[in-house]
Structures are given as structure tokens and as C-alpha cells.
UniProtKB/Swiss-Prot annotation:
Cited PROSITE patterns: UVRD_HELICASE_ATP_BIND (PS51198), UVRD_HELICASE_CTER (PS51217)
Family affiliation: Belongs to the helicase family. AddB/RexB type 1 subfamily.
EC number(s) recorded for this UniProt protein: 3.1.-.-
HAMAP family in the cross-refs: AddB_type1 (MF_01452)
Binding-site positions, [4Fe-4S] cluster: C799, C1120, C1123, C1129
Organism: Anoxybacillus flavithermus (strain DSM 21510 / WK1)
Keyword DNA repair: yes
Cofactor remark: Binds 1 [4Fe-4S] cluster.
Subunit structure, interactors included: Heterodimer of AddA and AddB.
InterPro entries named in the record: ADDB_N, DNA_helicase_suAddB, DNA_helicase_UvrD-like_C, P-loop_NTPase, PDDEXK-like_dom_sf, PDDEXK_AddAB-type
Lineage: Bacteria, Bacillati, Bacillota, Bacilli, Bacillales
Protein name per its UniProtKB record: ATP-dependent helicase/deoxyribonuclease subunit B
NCBIfam families: addB_Gpos
Residues that hold ATP according to the record: G8, R9, S10, G11, S12, G13, K14, T15
Amino acid sequence: MSVRFIIGRSGSGKTTMCLKEMIDQLAQKPDGDPIIYLVPEQMTFQSEYALMNGSLKGMIRAQVFSFTRLAWRILQETGGMSRHHLTQTGVHMLLRKIVEQQKEQLTLFRKAADKRGFIEQLEQMLTEYKRYCVTPATLKQTEEQLRRHATANETVLADKLKDTAMIFEQFEQQMAHHYVDSEDYLRLLAEKIRHSSYMKRARIYMDGFYEFTPQEYMVIEQLFIHCPHVTVALTLDAPYEQLPDDLHVFRNTWRTYAQLRDIALQNGVPIEKVEQLRHNVRHKHEELRHLEAHYDDRPVCKWEKQTEAIIIGEATTRRAEIEGIAREIIRLVRDEGYRYRDIALLIRNVGDYRNVLKTVFADYRIPYFIDEKEPMLDHPFIEWLRASMEAVRTNFRYEAVFRAVKTDFFFHLDQPVHDMRMAMDQLENYVLAFGIQGDKWTEHWTYRKYKGLEGVHAPQTDEEKRYEQQLNEWRKLVISPLLVLQKRLKQAKTGREQCEALYAYAEHLQIPQKLERLRDEAEERGDLSVARHHEQVWQAFIDLLDQYVEILGDETLSLETFLTIIETGFESLQFSLVPPATDQVLIAHFDRSRLSNIRCTFLVGVNEGVIPMRKNDDGMLSETDRELLYHYSLHVAPASRERMLDEPFLLYLALVSSSERLYVTYALSNEQEKTLLPSMFIKRLTDMFPNVTKMQWGTDPFLLPLQQQLAYVTNDVATLGPLVQQLEAWKRQYAIEPMWWDVYNAYVQHEQWKERIAVVVRALFYENRAKRLNKQLAKELYGKKVKASISRMETFNRCPFAHFAAHGLKLKERTVFQLKAPDMGQLFHQALKVIADRLRQEQLPWSQLSKQQCEQLSYEAVEQIAPYIQQEVLLSTHRYRYMKKKLQTIMTKATTVLSEHAKRSGFVPIGVELGFGDGEPLPPLTFTLSDGTVLQFVGRIDRVDQAMSEQGVLLRVIDYKSKQKTLDLTEVYYGLALQMLAYLDIVLEYAEKLVGTSAFPAGVLYFPIHNPMMKVNEWLDEHELEKKFLEQFKMGGYVLADEKTVRLMDEHVEPGTSSLIIPVRLNKNGTFAQHSKVLTEQQFTMLRQHVRRFIVDVGEQMIEGVTHIAPYKQKNKTACQYCEFRDVCQFDEGVDAEQYRVLTPKNIDEWLKG
């Protein structure tokens, strides 16, 4: 037995030497003693490939092992495999069970235990303990020592050790004699090597390692003692006798070398002469050899010659960075004879790049393999299971149920997916509108179109009955299997029965067959990676259930605990890594990569804080914790400060990993447009290579030299974007290279591509303008007899397209089960009608109501109407019931103020919710348009009041609003506020029908129904408080400029005072103050005529098919601010600013003077 060390810098041929020796031995004696090539886990596949890629046609002696795989092999020979193996998923579930049972005993982690990711961190902590040979007893002993020194840091650390020791001890007790996890294998391997005849004959080659854990050192010690010969290859520049400086690039591998030598010497194992390889045999270019040799020199050793093998790439964004890399890969493969397998990307923050890598490499059709396991959590099958469990847990809340629905796994195999998705959208609309959850899922649903509070008692139509039946069929499709799952889970007595319930649920819905179909579809698309995911996920689910049954199958746990443990298992599931092809770009993690035979490396994302790594969280143990533990002689993994010293070595390995070309790239901003800075290493690299080649990615291609523009021409998908940029530049009068017209012609002449380029060209010259409808189509949309509301005309004047979307296309927002402002408005209006009707029935005037009566009437009115508002939303939850009380309070205040108005006013209500239209008290306001189309206006007026004066009957219109509002005559001029004056016009037009005689205009007023906060800065008596309260409810609008009419409206107004009811102030001489809102009878007539002209004009535009996207803009107000159709019209204020209809200020006084 002996130990030999092969050392040398990276690229000196250590791996090649090991492989050559093994191949020579196999060639000389194919059936000789075993040869074991021991490498890190991530290096096993490529090592097997390298071993078989030589002159050998096969082998029996040699095998490639990682430590774990070697443990399995030896335990199969010597015994120890009888215990059940727990995967990481099984370990997580067991830990979750222990945590749930011990939660009340936890000191520090009690609250954190419920947070996502806690079990993963806990498992990492216990793994670290095992790897560093730390036991629960050790933790308890250290905890006791810490308690004797009760500083704040030491107390917190002691609590951490107490909690983890308790969990660790429970975990070890559960594992003892029954189970084994991945970390136990190394301990068992160290124990069993002495009993293995296989190992006693084996020659060992260890390669690719830079450091080892204490557990691994235990195994290596046994290898040294019992194996005939062990060769260890290490990346080290010299066999130092003493520890180099802490900042030395090879400090880590020297420590490893020194510890391995000590183990050999302590066990009396002979150490052969160190084989030191001194020549760089990897790198083909001088600048790469210079970089390898002088990477860490201080001061910088410059390379003054032109540098072509090292390229620095700067990109505006991460996407631009990956697109630039993709173009370079295509160029290298197309023009320089590279294979995809010759190229590797090294990335530290893979998570930041994963999605953009997948998207861009798919567009460029670059085959790739990401050497990092993906979680299964986002797979639709796992999402369906998790959402189903959440639905059971939350009693079928909307969010959980539709998370499950949107995975498509509820659909039958013979149901078209597209049609069923449309059906589920309709089901979701109903669920959102009616607030379906809990027991409502099990009830028969009824369906009736909501026609307002007036139509709640209308009979159900045949169409509504058919839709109701369809809705209930869809409801049963979703809820029936969930109800069966819920029932079986609740009836289950043991963990086994709970798992059987989950399995039966999946089997009942034919999940295996559906996953097979998804796999086949992925294979047909050529997406082999996704196809393998669909293959793996079902087996992973079965394995998870098996693990649960093995660990907890006979235990009785609550449904909540079971679901929590299973959820923890799902969170730990990962897809296994099987490279789907041999010729593909390798995307590897910067820290863990082991590359071989790579011609070109892209070192990606070299930004500040990434490379070198910023000091980060050390998991459950902080950096201070780790230093304290080291002080108390308890050794765990190094703190981040210690790991920072290894950064130069990791960067060195990445920089020298390729033989021919090195790209170092970084981005200047991330996806959120946050600025990113280049790593300080970029400056060091430019200092070392002053003439390094630099590339910039993300600028418009037409700004680049022709040679660089050629790189943008790759394939039909990826080239389309740059071509569009070129055509846009040409459209803006920039000159573009003739090459791009060749590319354009290639698209046009290609049968499969010409339609795609036609769409692009149309988009290039697209203007966001809605076309005018032809007259016939407009007539079909709106009809020969158009029934409309006044507010519809206002909508047209705000933006014709909004009118077209609402009344032509009949688009509307999805109804959601919640109380919105329009619902509250409906309630207020209807409640006041109910109160007014009751007062009329009881012949009780408003002026005689007491405060108590106002309160009682308001309470009863809201109680009566609440069940009809938004599917009983006000009765659905405690929050909404509280809101109903608040609405009753608001109604009480409004009713009280209306009563006070009645006491002060000579006007009395003669109509509440007064309808006009066919079958209503008043006929519709009717106009005949130029083509014979009849325009009828229908609606309801909130309130009409009457008073008698010397000149005759006076009529005023009152509209209820949820806040104080005034009438802006500029908006009247531009047709944005027609309603109030149109209502006044209607009641005056049909006055004889309403009051039996002609009438005169008294005013148009807005009454606020709100809950104002009164601000007072001094003590006020009751009278003053009442005045202050009334002021908060002062009506806005305009009244007739007649003192007698004003006194009829507010009998308490005196010269020199302001009215508390209407927007008027009288001067001492009885004239109206400047800011009083008054209009003469002539001005009212003029405004009525203006409104009529505007209405006819809008009607004419409607039948002409006007649908322009032309929102108004008035100072800071635009039609787009609260428009529900913005996503439909896609009006872009930045691009389409010229399409605003700017409303210029109007001198209203001049206009009204005529």
C-alpha cells in the first residue's frame, strides 16, 4: 500500500495522466484487479465518457465512482443495505414531522418553523453536522459551555444549538436501525472498507477534488490503509512544506494536500515521490497561458500584444448578454468548426439567468444542458396536487380550487383542452361573481343575468336555465373528485390510508395517462427535456408516497399535519439530471463545475457582488455563530469570511478551463432596470491585457460595423428581431446595410416565412387607430331604434372607442364578489326610494321626521335592500356586515340632512327614482336622425322637486352622489356632463304630464351621500355644530338666478349670508355674490338646447360608425385615467400623444351671453 500525489497547475495534464495510466493498465490486463476512478458527483458522467472515449472497446476492471456510489457498491458487498434508504424528500418529510411534534419545545425556531424553506435549511444544517462529525451530544455540551458566558450572541447561539440538538437527536433516533440517508453512507463506507475484498485489491485514482469534509477524510484514511495503491491528483503549483499566505490562490488545495499527507504519515502509509507537472498542455494560445501563469501576480504582469483569445463582453441587460453569447456560439459553430459540446457557460447566479437562457437558446436553436437540478414545484402535476390539498385544507377557497383547475388535470382525456379552458373561464367568472367557496360548491347553482335591483324578481329565461345546467355540470367536474379526496382524507386513520387517498385521487383522474400524453406532445415538438420531466414526475410522486408510508405509514397524524408534511416533500422534489444529447452546450455552476475538454468558456454575469461573491447569509448559523463555535472547538463548515478567501481559486479555475477561447461577460442592468456594476476583476483583466478584444451587446445592430451585424443573422426565429430593428431604423430615415434587404427578401421568398414577415411589416406601419364602421354594420350593432342613456352620450364624448367597446362590442369587466362604488351608489339610491315610498304611504312629510325616525328608516331600508346587492355580499362576512352598519350610518346622516332641508325649503319631492321611457311615468326623450334612425333616451332621475311661485310651477332636479360634486359648465360645453341638464329638459318638456301644467327651471343640484369628517379648531355650541354639519352636505350645481326662487330653496338664507343648502351667497343688497352658482331662465334654455344639439350630433356620429381612439384631455384630466378599456385600445400616451383631443379652456360667461 502506498500513496502518490500528482500535483500541477490547472491545465498541466493531471487528469490526462490519470486516464492514460488507467487505460494502459486496462489494455495490458483487461481482467486484472479493480481500478476505481473516484471523482466528485458532478464529474462522474464526463469521466465515464472520457474513459470510454479512448482506444478501449470495453472494460470490466475500471469503474467511475463518487463517494456515495462507492458506498453503495461496498455496502452491497459487505452488508449494510438492509436499512431503507431515505431520499432528501424522505428526510424533509421526517424533519417536518419532528418539527411539528416538537414545535412547542423549540425556543428560537418556533415561529420560523412554519415558514417556507425552514425545513430545507434545517436539513442543510443537519447535513453539515454529519459531514463535520458533530453529534447531538457535542451540541449539548457546547450549549452548556455557551450558557456559562451569557452574552447576547452566545445566548442566541445556545438557543440555536438547543433547538437543532433536540431535532437532531429525534432524527437520529428515528433513523437508527431502520433508515439511512445519503450522509450516513460515508460513515458506513468508512466502517466497511476493511471488510471489502474488492477494495483490498483496488487501485484508486482520486481526481477533481479541491477539499474534503471530515467524513470524506475518514473514508480516505481507510482507503490509504486498506487499498494497495492510491493516487491523488490535486491542483497545486508546488508541494509546499509550510502553509502559503492566506491570500495565496492555492491555499485551499495546499491545506487538502497537507491533511492528506498527515493522514498517510499517521497511519504509516508510504508516500511516493510527488509527481509535479510543470508544463501547460491545455492552452493553445499564448495569452491564455499568460493568464494561467500570472493570474494572481502582484503587481499585474501585462500582456502587451493583441489579445484575441480573451474577449470581454459588455451588455446593456442580462437578456442582451445571453443573446450576444448565443450569437457568438452560432458563429463559432458555423464559421470556426466548433461543436456545441466544445462550449461551456459558467454562471454563479444561475437563477437570475435560467429563464432567459431557456428562451434565448430555444430561439437560436442551441442545444444545451443546465448542470443544476430543477425543482419539480412548478410542474403542473405537482401544482395540481398542492392546489388540491390546499383546496381541501381551506374548504375550497377560490384561489386554491382554480390553481388546480388551471393545470388542466380535471378534464377528461376525450375533452378538447381549448374548449374546456373556455368553459373553466366561464366557471371562474361565476365563482368570482357569486363568491363561491366552502359548502356553496356542493349546492345547486342558479343563474340569472343581473338586471339591476329593479329586475331581481324577473322570471328565469330558457337561455338562463340552459346555462345554469351547463354551469352545474362544470361545477361537478371540478368539485366531485375534490369532495371524494376530502372525504377519504378525513376518514383516513393512518398515514398509509392518507397516502392511498392521494394516490386514488390521481388515479381516478387518469393522471398517468394525461402525463403520457403531455410527454408524447413534448417529444413531437422535439422538447426532450420537458418530455423527461413529464416522465419523471409521476414516479417522483409514487416514491414520495412510498417514503411517507415507510416512515409514517402506521402513525396517526391530523389532516393538517399530514398535508404540511406532504407539502414539505413536494418542495424538495427535483428532476434528475440526464443529458439528453452528447452534442450540447454545457451550462454549469461557477462554484461546482468540473469541466474537461472544453475549447471555449463563457464566464457569465461577472458583476460586482457575484464574482467575487458578496458575503452572504450562512444559513441557520451566522458568521458570528461559526466563529464562536470555532472558539469553543466545535468545527463546522467555514464562515463566509473564510470562503471569501477561496474566491480567487474558484475564479482561477473558471478562467483557465478552456483550451482556445475565453469570454468574460457582464450586464449593466437587470430585469427591473436596476443598475449593475462590473466586477472589480474586469478592471484587473483589462490591466493585464490592455489590448483585449471587447464586445458590446444590446445596442441597435445598425450602429455596428457590418462584420458584427452579420452575427445577427442566425435562423428564421432569432434573426427576425434584428431585422425588425433594421427596418425601423430605415423607416426613421437611417441608412442600413444592403445585407438586410437580402435577409428581408429571403423571408419574403420562403414559403414558411413570408406570412411571418408580412405580419412584421404590417406591424411596422401600424397606427393605433380604430377604423370607422360602415353604416350597415353600425346599424346592425346599434339597431334602427337606439335606446340609450344620457351617460352613454357622455361616454362617446369622452372617447368614441370607449363607447364602441361598451355598447357596440358590449365588453365589460369581470364581475367580482365584492362591494364597489357603483354597488354602494345603487344601495343609496334604492334606500332613499324605499324611504320616500314609505313616507308617501304613511303620508308623513320629510320635514316632520325626528332624528330617531331617520335612523330607524335608514336602518330598515338598508336591511331590506342589502340581500339584493351583489349576490348578498353585504351578508357574506363579518367585514361586510360591519360595512353594512357603516352604510346604515351614512344613510342616517343623509336622511337627517334631507329632513333638515325639507324644514328649510319650500320645495317638495314629487318624484323619486322617476323613470322616463316606454312604460314609465314620463315618455322617452326622442330624436329622429338623418337616416331615419330613432334615438330614444331612457333612464331614471334620482329626484324631482316642485315649488309654487308667482310665475308658476318651479321644478328642480337632484342627483345623489357619493361625494360633494359641482356642475362644470366647460364639461357641459364639450359634452362630458350632459346628464343633469338633459334630466331638467325632460321634466320641463313633459311638465304637463308630471304636474299638470307647464313649468319653469329652478335648478340642477347634486346631493352628497357621504360620511364627512368635520374639522373644528375651537369650541362650538350645538347650533354652530349643526351649521357645520349641514355645510358638509351643501348641494353643488346651479339654481335659477332669482332671489325668490332661492328663498324657496332655503328659507333661512338672509342678505349678507351664504346658504347652508345650495351654492348661493346673497349680498347685503339682495343681489347674488360673485361665486354663487346661478343661471338665468334664458341661460337654462340655452343649455338645454345645447344639450339637445350635442345629443343629436353624437347620434349622427354613432350611425356613421365613428369608433376613433380619441380620448379627451383637459388640463391634467384625461378620458384614460379611469377607463376600463385601456388594455383593449392599447392607447399609449407616449406614442399616441397626438391622438388626444385637447379641450381648450372656454370662456363660459361669453358663451352663455350668446
